[in-house]
Regions:
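Acidic, low-complexity proline/glycine-rich segments
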Residues: 1-9
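N-terminal core-binding DNA-recognition domain of tyrosine recombinases/integrases
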Residues: 2-3, 14-29, 39-108
Length: 108
């Protein structure tokens, strides 16, 4: 993920990324990894919950409008299903899936 791609993320996620860079002093690379993991997670959820038109590709799925109510509606089962998706569909290895878990857990 590139720094300019962060603007396409939900405002709450953008604020979180600023916090971890400014206050928690994470490196720019770490912030971009978190951003990419969260973007993947939210795109997955929007597609799975049917909140994106079926003719819109995964990469073009708009997640910028995700709000606090949407985030509050996310369940542990959603996270588990996401990890299964990462393993089976994205072919993420164990280390990548573990990093994604950390990114999501720290955000929530």
């Amino acid at each position: 993920m590139r720094r300019e791609d962060i603007n396409a993320l939900p405002k709450l996620v953008q604020q979180y990324l600023v916090y971890i860079e400014a206050i928690k002093e994470h490196s720019e690379l770490s912030v971009l990894e978190y951003a990419g993991d969260l973007r993947t997670f939210f795109r997955y959820l929007v597609k799975e919950k049917g909140l994106s038109p079926t003719d819109v590709s995964y990469e073009d799925t708009d997640i910028s409008k995700i709000d606090l109510d949407f985030i509050k509606s996310i369940t542990l089962n959603d996270a588990y299903q996401f990890l299964i998706y990462c393993k089976n569909e994205r072919r993420n290895n164990e280390a990548t899936r573990a990093r994604r878990v950390v990114s999501i857990r720290r955000c929530f």
